[in-house]
Curated annotation (Swiss-Prot):
NCBIfam families in UniProt: PRK05309.1, uS11_bact
Species per Swiss-Prot/TrEMBL record: Porphyra purpurea (Red seaweed)
PROSITE patterns with a match to the protein in the record: RIBOSOMAL_S11
Keyword annotations of the record: Chloroplast, Plastid, Ribonucleoprotein, Ribosomal protein, RNA-binding, rRNA-binding
The name this protein goes by in its record: Small ribosomal subunit protein uS11c
Record has rRNA-binding as a keyword: yes
PANTHER family: 40S RIBOSOMAL PROTEIN S14/30S RIBOSOMAL PROTEIN S11
Organismal lineage: Eukaryota, Rhodophyta, Bangiophyceae, Bangiales, Bangiaceae
InterPro entries tied to this protein: Ribosomal_uS11, Ribosomal_uS11_bac-type, Ribosomal_uS11_CS, Ribosomal_uS11_sf
Main location, first listed in the record: plastid
Length: 130
């Protein structure tokens, strides 16, 4: 039987960042949650797709909640306690992801909406006819 060789690849170093920034990008199709330290170095991230949802289910609030819980748990394992939340995008999972971060035990110090709003720039997509 073959022995497994221990790989000496890149290892995740423990950051011990107590404060950080949580970026929530919520689109109509997916929600991506990235937790960084104050410098902007990523500590943990998760998305609806990475949490096991596929297709149209990725855009649901429950998928966003699952992604936020997963990212928050990883960040708290690295010592994070407080976070600022920057929300971006028009998706369904915005509020649910913030509530999931609070429920996971992270103290939220600031919630800021950084969704870019055009000064009448590009033409939006046409309305769906179902």
């Amino acid at each position: 039987m073959a022995r497994q060789i221990k790989k000496s690849g890149a290892r995740k170093n423990k950051h011990n960042a107590v404060n950080g920034i949580t970026h929530i990008k919520s689109t109509f199709n997916n929600t991506i949650v990235t937790i960084t330290n104050l410098k902007g170095e990523t500590l943990s991230w998760s998305s609806s797709g990475a949490s096991g949802f596929k297709g149209a289910k990725k855009g649901t609030p429950f998928a966003a909640q699952t992604a936020a819980e997963k990212a928050a748990k990883q960040a708290m394992d690295q010592g994070m306690r407080q976070t600022e939340v920057l929300v971006n995008g028009p998706g369904a999972g915005r509020e649910t992801a913030i509530r999931a971060l609070q429920a996971a035990g992270l103290e939220i110090t600031l919630i800021k909406d950084i969704t870019p709003v055009p000064h009448n720039g590009c033409r939006p997509p046409k309305k769906r006819r179902v």
